[in-house]
């Protein structure tokens, strides 16, 4: 009886047979494939960025956090390459030119840049996740998305330590 009341409440207010705000995040699979390809192509630049961060600190805790994030990025790259292959049947070549040219040697400013990048990527992963054709692929992307949110929290922590 309680479940029926709960169900009727949501039907009354227009939430039945659809996921809340689903239309905002429902995306085309082709768009998701383009985003995945771009994320894979940007991987080398991301690793260079983390190498720069490591070179700007000598704090043991900061180094451990940054290395943990780098390990997650390696895992994400493998998952994305696998997803790209499963969705397209093609492997991406990694012989592109790197565009990473950051001479900004300020640790805090680079942490802020990293935080902004992680938050921007959450939007991309949300788009990818909503376009996945099956639950296994959706869960793979969800794992990356939750890692991105965790990374953003770590960046906030490291930035706060710099103040």
How should each PLM-predicted stretch be described?
Residues 1-163:
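Non-heme di-metal
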């Amino acid at each position: 009886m309680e479940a029926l009341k709960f169900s009727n409440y949501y039907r009354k207010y227009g939430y039945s047979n659809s996921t809340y705000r689903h239309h905002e995040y429902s995306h085309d699979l082709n768009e998701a494939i383009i985003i995945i390809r771009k994320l894979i192509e940007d991987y080398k630049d991301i690793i260079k960025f983390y190498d720069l961060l490591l070179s700007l600190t000598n704090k043991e805790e900061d180094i451990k956090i940054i290395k943990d994030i780098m390990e997650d990025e390696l895992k994400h790259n493998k998952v994305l390459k696998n997803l790209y292959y499963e969705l397209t049947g093609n492997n991406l070549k990694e012989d592109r030119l790197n565009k990473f040219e950051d001479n900004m040697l300020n640790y805090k400013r680079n942490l802020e840049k990293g935080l902004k990048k992680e938050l921007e990527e959450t939007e991309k992963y949300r788009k990818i996740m909503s376009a996945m054709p099956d639950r296994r692929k959706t869960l793979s992307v969800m794992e990356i998305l939750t890692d991105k949110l965790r990374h953003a929290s770590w960046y906030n922590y490291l930035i706060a330590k710099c103040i």
